Amino acid sequence: MNTRSNRRRIAVLGIALAAVLPLAACAGGGAEPDTGSSEGGAGAGGTDPDTFTVMTANENPVLEEQLTALSEGACKAENEALPLEHQKVAQADTVQKVTLLASQGALPTHTIAGTALIRPDGDLNAAGLVGDLKAALEGAGTWGNVLPAAASTVEQVYGGMFSMPYQYNIEGIFYNKEILADNGIEEPQTWDDLVDAADTLADAGVVPMTEAGANGWPLTRIMGMYIFRNVGPDAMAAVRDGDAKLTDPEYVAGAQALADFADAGYFGEGFSTRDGDTSSNMFLTGQAAMTYDGSWLLSAINDPERNEIGGENVGFMPFPEVDGGKGSIDQYAANAGAPMIINAEQFGPKVVDWVSCIAENYGQQALQDAGVISGFKVNGDVTDISENTAEIQERIAGIDETVLWFEALMDSKSNSLASTNVTLLTTGQMSAEDYMAQLQASIDANG
Amino acid sequence: MNSIFGDRKTIFILLAPALVLYTLLKVVPVGWSLGLSFFEGNSLRGFEWVGLQNFTTFFTDPAALQSMWVSVFFAIVATICQVALGYGLALLYVFVLRKGSTLVRTFVFFPTVLPTVAVALLFRSFVAVGENQGPVNDIINFFGGESVEVLASTVGTMTTAIAMTLWSSMGFYAVLLYAGLLDIPEEIIESARLDGANGFKLVRHIVVPLSLPILLSSIIFSLNATLKVFDSLLALNGGGPGTSTAPMTLYMYRTAFEYAEYGYGSTIAVILTALCLVFTLAIFRSSRRKAEV
């Protein structure tokens, strides 16, 4: 009897102790910054690390290859002063890994991060770990290498120049010139023209527009672009600031337009479970006439093994206007790739040199080697650009004003909800009003 | 022998390594998680005491309640079907196939060793539409029907998930219950047969009561395993369409690791554990009542 109650007492004590442990963690929790300001606006004010550790996503091998190429070529001197070292992370695990590393004080020098984390009110920035690239590059005199359009997009999305624009993508509708010509369709200038064109194409037995519904965001892009064309380029900023609500009629019209488009079957059969590669292939093998996608598709378009319809047959047009809307057709949707930040605590002079060297040379390196359009100036000659790439580059050079994407300014929970619920919206299981109401409720609760 | 097991110090020294490892890896994290459920935040932002607020949030959070419903529904339906099917197969092995059951047993058991993610992807392509249409829709088309986009509806996804779980685990329960059925003495079956009990009557009045202990263990085991389902539903359709097939485990994972809210994630874990306990105790209680009667 005695031993049993003793044992029970020990067990209870053990569990109570374990339950109290988090209090100790709480006391020491939160990275206290001792260098750099808490807004990340101190720019280069950190101490150099021993190696230039770079963490990139598994899904993006190009960035790793190009940085390695730079370290052996144009940036050899900087590499000798501070050697490059690569780390990888699966893109879906980014938030988890970065939060963990940051809380242990082991955040790499240059790393991919989550959008919400690096904003001024995000966990990383509030802990003083996000370096200000504009201040650092201006200080080194190399700020001119960042394209103004890219800088503007990065500042719009992240609330400051916190990310290196290794990619600069514009979005629009890629179309099969031959199929459209065969059906007597010209580039649609308005949404109604687009719907009519889709109708004609559907009758001709071709999938009018293919989208990867399994990922969610390709569908919300279309809804978002409708809203930007209908309400104007500040549509989503107004929602973030509370000046407008997603349940306002002009916004619901976007959800309704998407639902109607899907309901008419213009995305093809089984679109809600279609993955990205399948969708791109449907376009590149001529089964679909159009696809709304971004200029990252160029790598597939320029690949003769994947592109069966031929590069000269691929046209690009901006998302059409909406009748009576305040947006205009030349406001392209642009994004600057996944956020790649510099750890403010390690932003010493050697790191600034490395970053400056990247800013000077990455534009030309990536375009020449991998056909990737970045947000950096191309300083030098590039040979053998495909016509499609050249066309996109020309459009980017002529851009005045860009818009972001639908979820760009949302918190991570609402971002997730927008993608998961769009399947229900486009398969008729949720009405446009309900979709917007739920999303607005989430933004109000979490934003 | 007795002098070794009689000496408490020796017992402690022999047990200590495994016990320490077990405590550190299992008991401490469970206690830590229980403690975390009264806080809010993550390791980077720091933790803030919120008391029982996480628990009250859980019961007013529609996403959390939906995930709880998905977990419970999946657990109950999958358990009933799995154990019933497994029991039917076990009866088949014992009474119909007898000696020749080894080959059938092996084949039916085989899917159990396959990784659950692989099985989920397999079933996903079974019900696919469009480009690479799967056999299910091919059969429907053959009989003149139109292709059904199974994974675009909650009912379709849930049905596929349950079919998938049954296919991969009925062999396991069949073997488990088969072992239990073998324990029933031949003489009892013989004498029952002599008394005129045959087929269904034999099963209902003799076999089931005698195999009740193993049946109840299987049900408890199955409930606990299916309440914690994660990879099958995630790999099949990402918890979709929307979040209508996202169980509590998936919601907990997303909360803790995608939204970086460790406190609320721990709360969900605690509630899931409590749910498993409730189900287990309920089965125990009902079995004890049966034995007393």
What are the language-model segments listed below?
Chain A
Residues 2-13, 26-122, 139-140, 366, ...:
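Conserved N-terminal structural module of periplasmic/extracytoplasmic solute-binding proteins
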Residues 77-89, 107, 183-186, 260-273, ...:
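A local structural motif
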Residues 88-97, 189-196, 270-284:
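Short helix-initiation/N-cap motifs at beta->coil->alpha
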Residues 116-171, 222:
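Hinge/lid segment of periplasmic solute-binding proteins
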Residues 158-166, 171, 195-244:
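Extracytoplasmic/periplasmic solute-binding protein
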Residues 239-240, 371-380, 390-444:
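C-terminal capping/gating helix-and-loop segments adjacent to ligand/active sites or protein-protein/ligand interfaces
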Residues 240-271:
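Glycine-centered hinge/linker elements that transmit conformational signals in sensory
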Residues 264, 305-370:
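Extracytoplasmic/periplasmic substrate-recognition and gating elements
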